[in-house]
Amino acid sequence: MNRPPFHPCAAAALAALLAWPGGAACADQVADFYAGKEITILVGYGAGGGYDVTTRLFANHFGKHIPGHPTVVVQNMPGAGSMKAAINIYSVAPKDGTTLGVFASSTALEPLFGNKAATYDPRKYEWIGSLHRDIASCAIWKGAGQGIKTLPDLISAKKTVTFGSTSPTAITSQHPLFLKHMFNANLKVVYGYKGTKDVSLAMMRGEIDGSCGMFESSVRSAYEQHIKAGEMKIVVQFGRDRKVPYFGDATQMYAMLQTDEQKRVADLIFRQTELARPLAAPPGTPKERVAALRKAILDTIKDPAMVADAERLKIDYDPVPGEEAAAMFADFYKTPPALVEQGRKYTQPDPK
């Protein structure tokens, strides 16, 4: 039987660099590579939104936990619901561990749903991890003028309720459209916003009635004061197994699903937020550098200085290890094609 060539540093990578006896030497190789270099993290959304803020805070501490202590900078690359950044990391960025990307897990899964513009395979990225294991929700600003407080209220609204989104590939579009098609809710999605911050500002200005894709972590850091003031109401949350305190008495959508098949289709759409802000390296990045970066993301998020900064800004981090993130993306591809097609139909924008 032909065996692949043995690479000591790849073996050490699988042992988290140091557990294997040759790991120290590999760690030295990683340190030698990164010393004096700069790592760029591309964020697939505009400045000031949840993706941007949480990534920048993380980046401030990330470099000191990477062997060689490289400088880490963040660059915004919005476009097509973060697909522009996803394509860049897959096809354009150098495959050496100096360019990473943070983009939506929903965007990463667009090839599964047949999006021809999504010219990448999420199973081939080197997943470094995810900054959050999150649950999403939808919020309504001042009851949309109809006193909407729950998902049943939204479903039965007499006047069309509008939600804002960056693009059809984003959960700000997919989540409300799932509600529309699953429950026949009277709602519409308005596109063209550059980022989640722009969607939220439009909601507060009254251009639209609500916003979906509201992560548990973002609600605490950016919107808690509006909820307490009675201006904004979380009307539905998408966690399957737990309720989120910050979401108050919001309807749990899964409780309204009637069949196992409906729940499996919902899992395909809403379990993605367990990888709320995934961090990826290009396919082909050397394994020892991937292992070092995977260790560094976990070390960064438990760094006392990072924890203090996060608490000050009311940002919650609940990281997902890179190996687990990779396994989750692979699992999505094991979904039966008929259920994938249902999920695609439920999240398709209405014809213009």
For each predicted feature, which ranges?
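Hinge/capping helix and adjacent helix->loop/strand transition within the periplasmic-binding protein
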Residues: 39, 64-69, 88-99, 107-205, ...
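Bacterial N-terminal signal peptides
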Residues: 9-22
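An extracytoplasmic/periplasmic, membrane-proximal ligand-sensing/linker region
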Residues: 35-37, 228-231, 235, 256, ...
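A ligand-binding cleft/hinge motif common to bilobed small-molecule-binding domains
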Residues: 105-117, 173, 177-182, 205, ...
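N-terminal secretory signal peptides that target proteins for export/translocation
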Residues: 1-6
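Ligand-binding clamshell of periplasmic/extracellular solute-binding protein-like
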Residues: 58, 80-83, 97-110, 130-133, ...
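Boundary at the C-terminal end of the N-terminal hydrophobic targeting segment
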Residues: 24-27
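Extracytoplasmic "Venus flytrap"
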Residues: 41-55, 78-81, 164-171
